[in-house]
């Protein structure tokens, strides 16, 4: 036999005016806070990830791509030398 936990049913919660008054403010506020966190660049500083313009050195603006599988080791060594 099923008992009751004493909690309000979910259908009562989402149909209440109080729920929508609270959430009509908090949901957009969280969205705006997240947007500001990312758009101001604070997310890069907090998590320590490089900004999009600093992934590569100034001289190298392309992805270091290995094109020949038989000379892969030589190409990787060349890429690493360019970083120094």
Curated annotation (Swiss-Prot):
Residue positions binding heme: 23
Topology relative to the membrane: Single-pass membrane protein
Keyword Transmembrane: yes
Cofactor(s) listed: heme b
Gene3D superfamilies associated with the record: Photosystem II cytochrome b559, alpha subunit
A cellular component annotation (GO) from this entry: plasma membrane-derived thylakoid membrane
Entries under InterPro entries matching the protein: PSII_cyt_b559_asu, PSII_cyt_b559_asu_sf, PSII_cyt_b559_CS, PSII_cyt_b559_N, PSII_cytb559_asu_lum
GO biological process, one term: photosynthetic electron transport chain
Membrane-spanning segments: 19-39
Segments in the Lumenal topological domain: 40-84
GO molecular function: electron transfer activity; heme binding; iron ion binding
Cytoplasmic side: 2-18
Location, primary (coarse class): membrane
Cofactor note: With its partner (PsbF) binds heme. PSII binds additional chlorophylls, carotenoids and specific lipids.
Pfam families linked: Cytochrom_B559, Cytochrom_B559a
Keywords: Electron transport, Heme, Iron, Membrane, Metal-binding, Photosynthesis, Photosystem II, Thylakoid, Transmembrane, Transmembrane helix, Transport
NCBIfam families (UniProt xref): cyt_b559_alpha
Record note on quaternary structure: Heterodimer of an alpha subunit and a beta subunit. PSII is composed of 1 copy each of membrane proteins PsbA, PsbB, PsbC, PsbD, PsbE, PsbF, PsbH, PsbI, PsbJ, PsbK, PsbL, PsbM, PsbT, PsbX, PsbY, PsbZ, Psb30/Ycf12, peripheral proteins PsbO, CyanoQ (PsbQ), PsbU, PsbV and a large number of cofactors. It forms dimeric complexes. Part of a photosystem II (PSII) assembly intermediate complex PSII-I; crystallized from a strain deleted of psbJ, it forms monomeric PSII before addition of the oxygen evolving complex. PSII-I includes 3 assembly factors not found in mature PSII (Psb27, Psb28 and Psb34).
Function: This b-type cytochrome is tightly associated with the reaction center of photosystem II (PSII). PSII is a light-driven water:plastoquinone oxidoreductase that uses light energy to abstract electrons from H(2)O, generating O(2) and a proton gradient subsequently used for ATP formation. It consists of a core antenna complex that captures photons, and an electron transfer chain that converts photonic excitation into a charge separation.
Family: Belongs to the PsbE/PsbF family.
Protein name, entry field: Cytochrome b559 subunit alpha
Organism whose genome encodes this protein: Thermosynechococcus vestitus (strain NIES-2133 / IAM M-273 / BP-1)
């Amino acid at each position: 036999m099923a008992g009751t936990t004493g909690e309000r049913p979910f259908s009562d919660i989402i149909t209440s005016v109080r729920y929508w008054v609270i959430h009509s403010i908090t949901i957009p506020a969280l969205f705006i806070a997240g947007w500001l966190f990312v758009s101001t660049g604070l997310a890069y500083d907090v998590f320590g990830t490089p900004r999009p313009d600093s992934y590569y050195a100034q001289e190298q603006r392309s992805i270091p791509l290995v094109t020949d599988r038989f000379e892969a080791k030589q190409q990787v060594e060349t890429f690493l030398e360019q970083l120094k």
